[in-house]
């Protein structure tokens, strides 16, 4: 049974040049991560500390939420609570309508992607403009982000150049020079920032004991979105809290190094209250996070800081692209988040993992996304989504390994499979795995036989 991820990945792989570029680009980011980590002898200690801080915070969430909201409200910030995506979208719309807002400029926010806020507001007559360059590109392409940090990296410079020409952003036909395109985008976005009547930002971290909203960007779009319009709306998942500034310092040292290999993002902005003469709203969103918190097996998913490191290192993501995943957040962490939100559909992504666990080793908060996926695979039969063919094969393997004589007979007959033409193994229904893999060559003799015959270098079998 081929999943939707596998089918989408097959479509992505029809362009080998793009796949190679995608793979190499993200692997370079992984190498940059390693180089940045190597500069800090205390790197693993930071990861341990980050994991402990996050675990402590999410298991004491009511206390920290009360502390956080009290600090915000003491400075005149209006705090809202949204149980799910529909409530969140409705709250944002009500705030915008109360201020007669027609144009909203946004800083980057994966929470708004999760809640499908943009299409909802646009349907209600609000002009929503992404202020992050990568997000703006995919918005104009009518696509969703393919990565949570670098949302448009699946596109080539030629594709971006053509898009900017079509949209009237660039005016030199065929000019796809990155510096020129960036200059054109800057001019276009500056106009949008100046016209917007409200700005919306996400939130990388919320500091409980000070009430800080911390937003990390490389383009300064969060600062533009909050310093020009008088109305500032913050979209924040309830898991984004850290207890204090000391805790924040740990994550600040990890976030950019894990996400892009930088020591820090170019801009780290702290918002505590509205600008003079303005108004600030913070919308705290649950949208299934309480359910994750109740799950002993998957609670650690809430430790994720959305750095994207698991995607950068994942061999499946790098070679299949972010749009091959059915959930809005792709890659290893997206598999688990999708399963928590809608397992009967998002199970399509559970097979998108080689279980190499490279993602476990790079995750700054030790979420262990690969290990989480392994657990999810064990649960597929409970929700009626296990592949029946795989289940039958597993039963067959159990029988084979529990009967030594049968196993030895199968081992002796295995070389006969070498006579089967490789094309005959490419049956979509019976062997979808074979389509993307080279047929292995079976050895004429097993290692055990060679060892007994004394044909293994450095080892001799001693007969009793």
Identify the meaning behind each predicted range.
Residues 302-309:
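Conserved, hydrophobic alpha-helical core segments of structured domains
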Residues 134, 263-267, 388-392, 424-430:
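Short coil/turn segments at secondary-structure boundaries
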């Amino acid at each position: 049974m081929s999943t939707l991820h596998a089918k989408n990945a097959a479509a992505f792989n029809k362009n080998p040049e793009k796949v190679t570029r995608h793979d190499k680009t993200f692997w370079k980011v992984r190498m940059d991560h390693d180089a940045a980590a190597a500069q800090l002898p205390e790197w693993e200690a930071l990861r341990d500390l980050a994991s402990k801080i996050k675990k402590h915070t999410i298991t004491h969430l009511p206390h920290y939420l009360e502390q956080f909201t009290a600090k915000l409200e003491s400075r005149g910030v209006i705090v809202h609570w949204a149980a799910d995506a529909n409530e969140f979208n409705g709250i944002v719309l009500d705030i915008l309508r109360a201020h007669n807002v027609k144009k909203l400029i946004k800083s980057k926010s994966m929470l708004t992607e999760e809640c499908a806020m943009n299409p909802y507001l646009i349907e209600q007559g609000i002009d929503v403009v992404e202020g992050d360059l990568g997000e703006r590109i995919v918005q104009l392409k009518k696509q969703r982000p393919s990565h949570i940090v670098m949302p448009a990296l699946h596109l080539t410079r030629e594709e971006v150049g053509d898009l900017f020409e079509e949209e009237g952003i660039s005016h030199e036909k065929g000019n796809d020079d990155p510096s020129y395109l960036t200059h054109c985008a800057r001019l276009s976005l500056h106009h949008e920032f100046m016209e917007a009547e409200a700005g919306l930002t996400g939130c990388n971290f919320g500091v409980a004991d000070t009430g800080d909203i911390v937003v990390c960007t490389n383009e300064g779009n969060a600062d533009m979105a909050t310093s020009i319009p008088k109305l500032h709306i913050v979209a924040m998942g309830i898991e984004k809290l850290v207890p204090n500034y000391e805790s924040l310092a740990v994550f600040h040292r990890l976030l950019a190094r894990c996400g892009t290999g930088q020591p820090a993002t170019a801009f780290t902005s702290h918002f505590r209250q509205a600008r003079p003469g303005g108004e600030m709203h913070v919308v705290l969103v649950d949208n299934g996070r309480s359910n994750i918190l109740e799950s002993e097996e998957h609670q650690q998913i809430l430790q994720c800081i959305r750095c994207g490191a698991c995607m950068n290192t994942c061999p499946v993501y790098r070679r299949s692209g972010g749009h091959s995943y059915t959930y809005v957040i792709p890659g290893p962490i997206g598999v688990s988040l999708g399963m928590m939100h809608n397992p009967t559909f998002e199970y399509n992504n559970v097979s998108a993992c080689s279980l190499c666990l490279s993602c476990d080793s790079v995750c700054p908060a030790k979420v262990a996304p690969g290990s989480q996926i392994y657990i999810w695979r064990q649960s597929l039969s409970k929700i009626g989504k296990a592949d029946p063919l795989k289940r039958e094969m597993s039963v067959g393997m159990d029988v084979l390994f529990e009967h030594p004589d049968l196993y030895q007979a199968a081992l002796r007959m295995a070389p006969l499979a070498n006579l089967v033409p490789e094309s005959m193994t490419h049956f979509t229904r019976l062997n979808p795995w074979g389509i993307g893999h080279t047929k292995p060559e079976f050895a004429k003799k097993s290692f055990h036989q060679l060892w007994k015959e004394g044909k293994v270098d450095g080892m001799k079998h001693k007969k009793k």
